[in-house]
Amino acid sequence: MSAATATGLGATVDVAHEASSIRVGPRSDAADLRVTMGEPLRLAILVGREPANVAAALATSLAANAELVLTLSTTGSGTVIDRASAIREARPNAVLAIADKGDVDGMIELVEALRLACAGGPHTPHLFVSAEDKARVRIGASAGAVPVEAIPAPTTRSAREAVVARLRALRRGGGDIVLRDEAIEAAARSLVLATGRATLVLDVSGESTSLALVRPDGSLIAAHSRLGIGPGADRIVARSGLDRVRRWIPRPIDAPALLERVFNRARWPNAVAPSVLTLALEMALSREALAHLLRDAARAGLDRAALANTRWIVATGDLARFPRAAQTALVVIDALLPEGTTLISRERPDALVVAGAIATRATADVSGMTEDLALVTSLWPKRAITLSVTDESGTIEEKVARGAFFLMPTTGSVRLAFSGSAAREAAAPLVLGVIVDARGRPLDLPPRDAERVPTLARWYSALACLPIEDGSL
């Protein structure tokens, strides 16, 4: 694959993976750009009682792909010593302080706890303060030797982007690199410029998970985390719980055995799934990484419905590299639970990440870098309806009742129509075809293995995701 800008000039990009990098482009001696995760950023948040400021701080943390290690509020209980101990144990690299109007004294108490926590310590975090001018002077004076930098209140789009850019600079260190989350956002923007339609890019790699929604007006909704299906797999278990991963495995497996597999996967950089069970585990981890990030985005006040119901979803990273296209499609459907009709596509290996890296420096050409997998129609009919699918082979009609989940393979361009509705949908040639999902929202899995395993097996078999026999792997 050749990586090129819109002007035709070639560029060579190194894309870092778990324990190696892949070079894409014409040069063999060196790379023009490097895409990496950057340095981990441990972020602590100091906030008041204002809900908008709390949500803005959480959204900033997600946009900057910072690990939120501590949140302290001026309304919380505890002495200065208690707060200082909490900060010292959290070991933040950066602290984001957003002061409410009229509550400067409370923020000063939190900053004094920060100063106490850093006294005599080997590492001093950067303190970013958002407050009115007079209040910021008082807060800065209480910080002592802690370096203080003024930032705008991240409650508006432009201000949040400025704060995120500053936090990302800390992750770059002294290197001239493109952060992977930056490349994902730039790739989404390039796709929107090329197609004119809103695009959600989902990226799941060994060490990170990203959601980047760009609309035709240029607005961006983005969230990133250090959850992954490789070295970041143990983080998923630590934050979501083992049972939430286990519930997606279409076979009975006890918790200790599953936990061992998760931690073994975290210790195997660039591992290729050696068995069907391991592949099912990676699919389960991908679902939970995306679902957890969506929940974090909702808590931060981001538009979860807009993220989940975008009409075009593009998968990148390890999510796009599952051996079967149906595996990518099933993970996206189960994690996002889209409603209506959605087109699911995937990048060609590392193509969009490379294009995104180039797009941070110039205009990138993204034509031919994605392939359309499936047109997914999600519905919950009161009574059975008829779905008509027309492709090059003719028209096929299927009855759809509640609980249905199946694939209708297609050839060439596709058109959809529903009985009793004037709505029509169309798509270019698809790798899989049309996926009909009438399982309902939210998607509830039976808690007992005797019911859960056959249910999952039916869903996997419906899309021919995995070789399943006798109701299990």
Kindly label every feature range from the protein language model.
Residues M1-G25, L41-L46, A84-D103, L191-G218:
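Gly/Thr-rich phosphate-binding beta-strand-loop-beta motif of the actin/hexokinase/Hsp70
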Residues M1-R49, N53-R83, L220-R226, G230, ...:
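Early-domain small/polar-rich strand-loop-helix modules and first-structured segments
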Residues S2-G10, A30-G38, L72-A90, A169-T199, ...:
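Conserved phosphate-binding catalytic cores of ATP/NTP-utilizing and phosphoryl-transfer enzymes
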Residues A97-D100, P125-E132, S205-E207, T310-L319:
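Glycine-rich beta-strand-to-loop/alpha-helix junction loops that act as flexible
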Residues D176-V201, T209-L473:
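Helical "lid/coupling" subdomains associated with nucleotide-phosphate turnover
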